[in-house]
Each structure stands twice: as C-alpha cells, then as structure tokens.
Amino acid sequence: MTDESKRCRTKKVKARTGCSTCKRRKVKCDEQLPGCKRCAKIGVECPGYHKPVKWSVKYERHLVNSSPTAGNSFSCFDSGAGNLSNLMQPKSNPGSVETQNHNDNEVQAPGPLTRGSSSSLSDAREHLEDTLEMQPPSTLNSEQLSTLCDDVQADEEFPCALNALHDDSLCLTSYIPTLQTSLILDHYFTTVCHFNSSFDSANNPFRSEVSRMMADSPLLFGCVLSMSAAHLYQGDKSSSCIPLEFQTEAMSHLSRTLSELPTRNECEVDDNRPMALVSREKILNVSDDLLLSIIFLGMTAAWHDVSATGLPHLHGSRQLFRSWISLNNLTDIEKRRKMTRTQIFVVSSMVYWEAMSSALFDQQYEGLSHLTMFCDPHPPALVQPCPWTGVATPIFVFLAKTLTLVRNNQALKSLWVFESGEIHRRALYGELLAKANSLEREILRYRLPSLALIEDIGDPCTTPDHLLAISRCYRMAALLELYSAFPEITRTGGRPDSAIDLDRGDEKTHLIMGLAFSILEILEKIPDDSGTISIQLLSLLIAGSVLGPVPPRGEDEGPKRLETLRLRTFVRQRIHKMYAAVRLGPIGNAMAILEEVWARMDMLPAIQNANSAISSFHWINIMSQKKLETMFG
C-alpha cells in the first residue's frame, strides 16, 4: 500500500454507542430499530441503546421528596438518606463510565450496583449463585478471591442504563456486581455472617434466609452491602466514603419503597387512652425482606458511626411490624406456634433490636405492648435457635421492658425541682412499681427450654448449652436491673434460679451482687471461640457495672474484694477478645462506660456501701453523661 493511499484512508473512529451485547462481543453495532441485526442473528433480544450514565444521589433525593406520598409517617427515612447525601462529597468511581454527551452536564456519583443486559442474565445468575453459595466462613483463599475479582473486571467496562438499575421488578440475578461490590458481598458471607450471629452453619439465617430473599429483593441486597461495607472498611479513613455511599444508596432505596406502599386509614383504640379512638395509617403489604432491611440498617447504623443509635429506623419500623403481624395473622397463638423459619428470624431480630435500643431513649412502657404476644411462657416442642436471641426470644422482650422501666424511674428524679414534685413522683413511682412487680412474675414464670428440645444448628463452636447459658444470663440481667431500680420487689422473696444462693442480710445488695456474680461465672464457662460472644456485650455491661466498690489495698483484703477484682479482669478480657473478633466501635464504648463506673465507685468513701454505689452510678446515667450512646448489640 502506497504512502498516498495510507494518507487518503479514512481514520476509523472507535464507536462508543450501540447495545451492550455488541459491546461485550467487541463488535460494531448497526443500531437498527427495534433491535440490531447482530443480536437477531445470534438469536438474543437486543437490549437497546441506552446511554451509560452515572447516578447522583442528590437527584435521587429530590425524586424521593417529590413523591406524592413522601410526607407520610416514614419521612424519617427520607431525612436520614438526605443527611447522609449531604455528608458525601462528589467522587468519581473508577468502575463506571461517563456519558459521552458533552452538551449535558456529567452526572457523578458512586453507583454501587450495575445491571447487565438481558442477554447476560445467565452469566449474572451463574456468578451470583457461586457467590451466594452456602460456604463456611474463611474458606476462600487469596487465589480464589483473586479469581472472583477477575471474573467481574470485564463487566465493569460496560455500565448499563440507570432506569434498569432501580427497576424493582427485576430480581437480583439480573445484576452484575462490580469488582468492589463483589468484594463487599464476599466479605458478608465469609466474615459478617460469622461474627454477626450466635452460631454459624448452613442453618444460619444470615446465610440461608437472607441470600434466598435478597435474590428477589434489591432493597435487602443494598442493605446487606451497606453493613458489609461498614465492617470491611472499619477504621480505614482513606476509604470512609465507600460505606457511606452504600448506606446512602440503601436508605434512598428504602425511602422509595416506603413511599410506594399501599395504605389506608383506620380507626383504632389508642394504647395510652383505652377510651379514645385514633385514626392511624395501616400498611396493606409489608414483606419479610422490607422489615429485615430496616432492622439491618438500624442495628448496623453504629457500624458506620459509633454514635449513631439507629432510633429513627426503629420508630418507623414499629408501625410496619404491627402491620406485618396483622397481615400474617400472628395475633392467633396457633399461627405463632407454626411460624416459618423466616418469620421466626424476623420476630427474633425485631425483639433483639427493641431490647438493645430500650436503654438508649425514654419511651412509654405500653409502647412495647406489641411484643407481649411473643412471650408464650411455654416454649414450642422444638426450639429453633435464632442468631441474636438464641433459644429464648421472650427473655429479650422482658429485657426491653425492664430497661424501659429503669429509664422511666430515672426520669422521675428530675421532678424534685418542682414544689409539688415529690408528691407526683411518689404517685408515678407507685405505677412503675406495679408494672415492675408484674414483669418480675412474668420473668420468673417463663420456663427456659430443655437442652433436648433445642434444634441442632450444626455449629461445633456453639453448642445448644451455650445458647441456653446465654438465655439464663439475660434473664438474670433483666432481674438485676429490675431489683436495682425497684428494691421493694426483693422483699417478695422471689429467686430466679436455684443456682443462686444468697444471704438474707441486705436484700438488695446481696441479691444484685449475687446475680452479677452468677452471670459472669456462667459466661466464664463459655469458651472464647463460641459464637455467642457476639451477643454477650450487654450482659457483660449490666453485670460488670455493679462490681464494686473496691476499697484501696490494705483496707479490705477479704474474699469479696478479690473476687470482685477477678471478675472485673474477666470482663475486661472478654470484651477485649470480643473486640478482636468483631472489631466494631460500640464495643469500645461499652468498655469505656464500665471503666468510668468502676472509677467513680472506687472513689466513694469507705463508709458508703455497695447499695448506694450501684444507685449513684448506674451505667445508663454514665453512658448519657459521657455521650457514649450506641447500639450494644
């Protein structure tokens, strides 16, 4: 070929348009309508010629807020997503491609998920089935992980249309994960599922139920990515924006889903005023995955920011949970005894969330009435262990109610500033005491399941007796808090377990210290590698907070002082091992609260007894004073 012909030859311009099928095959697309000829030739449906764009959360926020139903009772989710969006700075994502239309402004944002064309559905399905496979934790070596990353690199080069990304009619198998998404999803199944449950095996609902549901729920999929990213990048300041992006995306998706729920107004009896009727908005369709998504976002809010409590999510989820109960006819005791595994998982997760949150804010005792139906004093014939509540979900209902009464009692102390405050305080205290007496009887009446009736979970590290021991600990923790706040109850002579053998001198002090010692001695017998270590934190905090005061060396070298010091050491070591295994900020807050409680108790004059020390320095008060509120679950 002559030089002149080379110069005359028209320069080929690389096409950046066309359907994604032709792009993947790296061939030129003729862009015919309704579909290109090459797709017709190979016998696939042409996906069309959408221009690739990058999604901006700020525009998504405006769309959500402009929804005709955005002003409903779930506006807290919209504001939460908006606040997170405002914290984010624009940052380009190397795994996405910018639009080539320079006449329009380029839209720049993270876009955690991308969707493949319809011709690549089988590839996406095969990839996700491999990723979601029920495999034990930490079984992927570095070579396998590298292969997993290589498999999705080619898919990152071809982002797809935005309207397909947020199409909830499409199942998860329509999505092709980016490299980053694949790493985060792998981290969920290899690490988060392992430490976020009291047991881990193929029976772990975080593996079995969640993976099954999120295959058809982009919302749940986004929430899983949010919590996994929060743990994966924990403490990595250079990558702190990544989990924030996934959290914002999940909250925006949640806001959008809530705004589309069908509702109707109904008149119901007010829980606080039995003679009054109130108009309430009833949700007509609440799915399991929607409830779990909100629970996951609320429970893991502190993974993103240790000071986050997740309470805005809790307040919104209660209405959804009540509607979910009604839709599933769970007010019928026979229906409750025949709940599916998914329903048991949802109920236990909601109850655990309520228990962990009840120490963080003041609420009316009647606000937890919707949980009472799940406190059947007679366990079913075969108990299915739950990731967070173990084998005794009712115990955590009792704990939630107990901590609510404790906070109510603490709030009464502020009435002294009023001239007639003491009169009102005594009247209100009498009401709380009556509720505390009734609650104590419920706790003592509840029968823990026998070891033989606990379903095998297939985890050699977490045996059924570990789960049963945790249930005993939390039952005693609830009683400890109840007796500490309402000492009059101790005169009834009730005892939670025959294993507790106490003197009858100072009823309150001996009973509380005896309960604390019993809790910690039970926890000592549970090995450090037990999966239950993930749900021990609040019991350690409650029992550890009454270990004192310890007089200075030389004043009292008796067995009580030595035992108190020994148990304090155990609490420190167990919490440190818990942090080493889980590596989440809220664990550090719990240890800081205990150290402050112990320091203040030990500074009391020697003439003051343990009773006054426990009353003066309750861990909830210290938590509030030091601004250490967080989710301890």
From Swiss-Prot:
Amino acid composition bias (Polar residues), ranges on this chain: 87-102
Keywords for this protein: DNA-binding, Metal-binding, Nucleus, Transcription, Transcription regulation, Zinc
BP terms from Gene Ontology: positive regulation of transcription by RNA polymerase II
One Pfam match: Fungal_trans_2
Segments of the chain annotated as binding DNA: 19-46
Keyword Metal-binding listed: yes
Subcellular location, record wording: Nucleus
Region forming the signal peptide: none
PROSITE patterns from the UniProt entry: ZN2_CY6_FUNGAL_1, ZN2_CY6_FUNGAL_2
Knockout-associated phenotype: Leads to elevated expression of BEA1, BEA2 and BEA3.
Entry function: Transcription factor that specifically represses the expression of the gene cluster involved in the biosynthesis of beauvericin (BEA), a non-ribosomal cyclic hexadepsipeptide that shows antibiotic, antifungal, insecticidal, and cancer cell antiproliferative and antihaptotactic activity.
Name by which UniProt lists this protein: Beauvericin cluster-specific repressor BEA4
Source species of the chain: Gibberella fujikuroi (strain CBS 195.34 / IMI 58289 / NRRL A-6831) (Bakanae and foot rot disease fungus)
